[in-house]
Amino acid sequence: MNSFSARLRSGASRNRFAAVAATTGLVLGLTAACGSSGGSASSSAGSGVIHVLVYGDAGNTVEKQIVDTFNKTSKVKAVLDTIPGADYQSKLNTIINTPQAPDVFFNWGGGSIAPYVKHNLLLPLDDMIAKDPGLKSNFLPSVFNTAVIDGKSYGVPMRGTQPVLLFNNKKVLASAGLSVPKTWDDLINDVKVLKGKGITPIALGGGDQWPTLMWFEYVFDRLAGPDLFRKALAGDKSAWSGADSGKALGMLKQLTDAGAFGSNFDSVKFTDGGSPALLAKGKAAFELMGSWEYSTQQSGNPDFAKNDLGYSAFPSVQGGKGDPKDVVGNTNNFYSVLKKTKHPDAVAAFLKLMYSDEFVKAQLGIGNLPTTTNTANFLSTSASPDYSQFQFNLVKQAPSFQLSWDQAYPPAAATPLHTAIQKFFDGKTDADGFIHAMQSLSNS
């Protein structure tokens, strides 16, 4: 992976919230927003064109390549339209129910498309899958299921996966006589030892808020299993007030009370390189972060990345209901289809290319890790084969891959969710306050 990959991952995966903040529902205006042609799902019928709308960033090189491949053999031609990343979600909402709507569009699955499903704008892909089972079977199930809503499939993975891993500074651990923690108790012990040596145990970009959320996602999964969050997301507000929720919050408080993150983590950010620098310079031993941490370190601290950057799965919790192989993070990005497309057969043919060898090799070439079953055949060609293999095995073996909470919920829930987790970590609200805040989130 390279510096470009770091920007791609932290951009398309995390920065959607700036675009979403002012866009809490569907805006049914008539403003065109596509970056190339002004066609649409409805107006392109006679011209034999399908419009593919994507998040505008450097990853578009692969998307353009795949569109060009499709156009070599298809009578119906595909046109790639882009919206600059910072404007993507808001402008998509503006055009999604207008004549300027695309046939196919980029999204994050989960909550990012739930409002469109609710408004009956998307085409379930189940009929396409019945005709071509490969549209489902050629993808890792834990990833594909992120775009399944109410039992129907609404998306095909189209970029790379981004699991959250526990990164470490191998030199710091060795000097402290510690090894990578396998269990929660191991982690708590490591925190105490590192604190005693004057080292901040865990780097945390609390100023960004979303890095803190990763701790909640894993602890809740390890302790309660994935069903607690699934029930909450489905509208069962009592899930947050159950015994398992209380235990998970107790574990998180145990971590903060032990001083695991130091005293000023809310003034540190990942996005400006602050928390990665703490890890690289040996001022912290661990950082829980998405897989883009690796390429971030390769870019900013190449010697550290080459020699001393370690990574592992999140520790298990003794007696917990969650499988130690469960993963959280950003499962992938997806292509979804507008119900009013005039060329569903052409769209189906286009989507088939998302599991082609060409697609896999092209994504690996820019530092992404595709989630197709044939990806394993090409991992040796990636920029960091060992790291890619570790991630792929982790995702492939995961019984559950929980999409980040702030992406599983609809966009309007992101800010109150981030505020709730920050206040709990800061000690400004107790468990009851956190539970009340989570029960107040809108899941529609």
Which positions does each model-derived feature cover?
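Hinge/lid segment of periplasmic solute-binding proteins
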Residues: 110-164, 188
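Extracytoplasmic/periplasmic substrate-recognition and gating elements
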Residues: 258-261, 301-366
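C-terminal capping/gating helix-and-loop segments adjacent to ligand/active sites or protein-protein/ligand interfaces
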Residues: 369-376, 388-442
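Short, solvent-exposed loop/beta-turn-alpha elements that line the ligand-binding surface or hinge
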Residues: 126-139, 206, 223-247, 300-304, ...
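Glycine-centered hinge/linker elements that transmit conformational signals in sensory
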Residues: 193, 234-266
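Extracytoplasmic/periplasmic solute-binding protein
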Residues: 154-158, 164, 188-241
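Conserved N-terminal structural module of periplasmic/extracytoplasmic solute-binding proteins
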Residues: 2-114, 119, 131-134, 362, ...
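Short helix-initiation/N-cap motifs at beta->coil->alpha
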Residues: 82-91, 110-111, 184-189, 265-280
